[in-house]
Amino acid sequence: MKAVIFAYHDMGCQGVQAVLDAGYEIAAIFTHADNPAENTFFGSVSRQAAELGIPVYAPDNVNHPIWVDRIAELAPDIIFSFYYRNLLSEEILHLAPAGAFNLHGSLLPAYRGRAPLNWVLVNGESETGVTLHRMVKRADAGEIVASQRVAIAQDDVALTLHHKLCQAARQLLNSILPTMKCGDIPSVPQRESDSTYYGRRRPEDGLIDWHKPVSTVHNLVRAVAAPWPGAFSYNGSQKFTIWSSRMCPDAQGALPGSVISVSPLRVACADGALEIITGQAGDDITVQGSQLAQTLGLVAGARLNRPPATSGKRRIRVLILGVNGFIGNHLTERLLNEENYEVYGMDIGSNAISRFLLHPRFHFVEGDISIHSEWIEYHVKKCDVVLPLVAIATPIEYTRNPLRVFELDFEENLRIIRYCVKYRKRVVFPSTSEVYGMCTDASFDEDKSNLIVGPVNKPRWIYSVSKQLLDRVIWAYGEKEGLRFTLFRPFNWMGPRLDSLNAARIGSSRAITQLILNLVEGTPIKLIDGGQQKRCFTDIRDGIEALFRIIVNDGDRCDGKIINIGNPDNEASIQELATLLLDSFDKHPLRCHFPPFAGFQVVESRSYYGKGYQDVAHRKPSIDNARRCLGWEPSIAMRDTVEETLDFFLRSVDIAERAS
């Protein structure tokens, strides 16, 4: 049986040798060129392949059509991936008749994603393992062929566990590969309900929070011990790394981060103390704990701190147009929680951002983007990242005011995009899930799904096509003139400050706000065309975290990307949303201050939205791009979002005024 192998790291070396030992013919091996900035403590697949006389390649993009064609010419019967760092396209996965199979360093479906070796230690697990699974479009989600468990000892650190996993992988492959070679390939579906997903870890994730339990801090030390970058803290401006530690139960009443003693070197955590066995000050040599205390000048009672503010480094300036809107005000809060961001904003009102107006890193001007073009151009030039969030995005306005939707959503925003091109500024643009229109795919893929809208005489599509056209213009500017951009597509984000009850009174709001108004005023909840349309509702906190990671843009992985941001697990019909909202309303402590429930009322969309409206039966996102580029996974259940949104609006109502 002829195999093509994608491999890297020690696991890659183990996999290549196991495939050879099982009697497969290896037609070619694809690997990665080593990164000079990375600590390459592991074996070299390219060297191994060269010594074995096997053709080996390290393309920048193995999914490029040229490489897909070359792999097809190799005519593999089977494909293996052993710690290859890039996802393989469906075109490659379909080249091998027997299938494509990946070795993953956890017991799937737990710990899908990046760095499972480190994450299991961070989380204090007592067991992990390796899994061979069939590769499908979604990372780590295919049927399981075989797995092998590995016990995690209390004294295991990242490197010792790595060696255990390599040994387990070799045993697993030696056992299953001969069977697969004979055509007998076991297949057990993964239980999605048991799946967990983790993103990549960065060196800065090793920063210790002394307010955490001692077990959490100790597990972090274990998880990133050498040859990984290490867990670290600061004494003043001096950074130091902790390479090994042990837990002590008694913090002697000291505040978290306080040095309890210097010989041995012990530091208080939330519920105990961490004894530092070995560590390193800056780029100095590794020494034992008491010597580290001397090097750092530590004494009992000293307080360790978070990294000092770097006055020499300019903060990242973010321009948010539409800063008072739903996304804008929540994003502002997230950015201001980080020391290295400064926010400049414009909007026609300030009610939602009044809590930030005195913040020293928030600069607001009340104005209209269609009027204050000079201010906007100046601040595009001044800032680093631009988010043009101004848009008319309420469905009833698409049929009421289609020309105004086009003028604001397309024409005014196009001018801002051109400023970004002119001054070479990065733009993070809010596309919309509406661009998929009546797409028939089970889940909407940013890079493959067709964008399908209705006829011209249905003006409800003016918003969708305005956004889609601007998406295409931005993409073209990126391709032809080097514009740095990311398009993000929110899928039904919900939470506090979504629209207002006053907007709902004139029909100019999103669904949940309109439903809450019906409950507050004791009017029937209107179910448009029966309310069977399904949407995937996403908590604003989940959405904003993803958007924040797009702005951070770690490793420039979001450049030139389109990213859906939604929660596929929170799919529900509008009727189901209304029922859940009613249940939460009846349980709310303020329920007694509002009228009785007036029931549900089914209405036709034409009578509600007017002539020219069409609805969409379902709208579910694929979030593979978000997982891959952001290391992001939504986590907040729909019920929690509904309850928090309802609570916000009920507490905003003047109860005394209602009673009078």
Curated annotation (Swiss-Prot):
Catalytic activity field: UDP-alpha-D-glucuronate + NAD(+) = UDP-beta-L-threo-pentopyranos-4-ulose + CO2 + NADH; UDP-4-amino-4-deoxy-beta-L-arabinose + (6R)-10-formyltetrahydrofolate = UDP-4-deoxy-4-formamido-beta-L-arabinose + (6S)-5,6,7,8-tetrahydrofolate + H(+)
Pathway(s) of this molecule: Nucleotide-sugar biosynthesis; UDP-4-deoxy-4-formamido-beta-L-arabinose biosynthesis; UDP-4-deoxy-4-formamido-beta-L-arabinose from UDP-alpha-D-glucuronate: step 1/3; Nucleotide-sugar biosynthesis; UDP-4-deoxy-4-formamido-beta-L-arabinose biosynthesis; UDP-4-deoxy-4-formamido-beta-L-arabinose from UDP-alpha-D-glucuronate: step 3/3; Bacterial outer membrane biogenesis; lipopolysaccharide biosynthesis
A GO molecular function held by the record: UDP-glucuronate dehydrogenase activity
EC number: 2.1.2.13, 1.1.1.305
Residues of the site described as Raises pKa of active site His: D140
Site (Transition state stabilizer): N102
Summary of subunit composition and partner proteins: Homohexamer, formed by a dimer of trimers.
Protein name stated in the entry: Bifunctional polymyxin resistance protein ArnA
Encoding gene (name): arnA
